[in-house]
A protein has these predicted regions:
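Alpha-solenoid repeat scaffolds
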Residues: 59-62, 178, 248, 287-292
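Exposed alpha-helical structural elements
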Residues: 51, 147-149, 249, 276, ...
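Polar/charged side chains located within well-ordered beta-strands of beta-rich proteins
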Residues: 43, 71, 164, 258-261, ...
Length: 319
């Protein structure tokens, strides 16, 4: 008799005491049985770990499958995900964030899709949760893998690391880890490369993950070092996609990826760092790209040095 697929859910934990209860309960209450839980304590300064362990006590049938791994010093999100994978034993890895929550049948649906398709990576739709508002988000995964990779590069498909069921042997054999410190851009570095290398990518046509945003969570301004790591992430991605045999198939998508990255940089930067952002990717024409009109206008205004207006638009309107 074939052994059941085992899943390792890996969750970095830092500063999550407001959210950890709902997150952990949603993981413990999965209808799928064969799950281990790897919580990586990235030196959180609050009571997240104590609260997590208190919640686990309510699920004695799961307690033996719960493991907390402690970092000796704060290392960031990408390093925490890496640690989770290295401590996992499941056939598949499921990365998850400590402020989100899962539908009870989520892992069962992911596993069923993996069994049916043999995919290295399985994704699903998700709900965008903001306060009392729940908005379903439908993603597109074309049957042609090259089309999907191009959609990822150009941000037409979701590039999140969380909420994907990924074969553990596929990760380890291909060393699919983001470099430590690329916490703002780990998704963008990893997911297009994973999709390119995967023998098959599959999708569950249902919203299984609840991705939670809180007031103020999207308006953080990062320091210059964070901007530099985001530029570095694009360089890493470009190095990979210009070094493959079919690089020409992704040349135009890479150019557009840089423009999307520039928009992201403006969204992250303090106004004082706009000159640094403005200096990036100026060899790529904006108006002949397939960026939406709002992003084209934003980059044009920024190119005209209308920094105050650009900052106002970014932080008061959705771009």
């Amino acid at each position: 008799m074939k052994s059941p697929i085992t899943v390792s859910i890996c969750v970095p934990v830092y500063g999550a005491e407001r959210f950890i209860d709902r997150c952990v309960r949603s993981l413990m209450e999965q209808t799928y049985e064969h799950i281990e839980y790897i919580f990586v304590n990235d030196c959180t300064k609050d009571r997240s770990i104590e609260m997590l362990l208190e919640v686990v006590k309510d699920y004695p049938q799961r307690r033996a499958a719960v493991h907390v791994v402690d970092h000796e010093q704060n290392r960031g999100l990408s390093a925490s995900r890496h640690t989770g994978v290295l401590h996992a034993t499941g056939d598949y890895i499921f990365h998850f964030d400590d402020d989100d929550f899962l539908a009870p049948e989520a892992i069962a649906h992911y596993v069923a899709c993996a069994e049916e398709t043999g995919a290295d990576m399985v994704m699903a739709d998700y709900n965008f949760v903001f306060g009392d508002q729940v908005t379903p988000h439908h993603d597109v995964v074309p049957a042609d893998k090259a089309d999907y990779v191009r959609r990822l590069l150009t941000r037409k498909s979701t590039i999140n690391v969380w909420g994907r069921l990924i074969r553990r042997s596929f990760i380890l054999e291909n060393e699919l880890f983001a470099p430590d410190g690329l916490d703002l851009s780990e998704d963008f570095v990893l997911i297009p490369v994973m999709a390119y290398k995967a023998a098959r990518v599959a999708k569950v046509e249902a919203p299984l993950v609840n991705y939670v945003k809180y007031a103020g969570s999207g308006s953080t301004v990062v320091r210059r070092r964070g901007l530099e790591t985001t530029v570095r992430a694009m360089e890493i991605l470009e190095d990979f996609f210009t070094g493959i045999p079919d690089a020409a198939d992704y040349e135009e998508a890479l150019k557009e990826a840089k423009l999307h990255n520039k928009v992201t940089l403006y969204g992250l930067a303090a106004q004082a760092d706009y000159p640094y952002v403005r200096a990036q990717y100026n060899d790529i024409p904006v108006w002949s790209s397939s960026l939406d009109l709002k992003k084209k206008l934003l980059l044009t205004l920024a190119g005209w040095h209308l920094d105050g207006l650009v900052f106002h638009i970014i932080h008061h309107y959705i771009i």
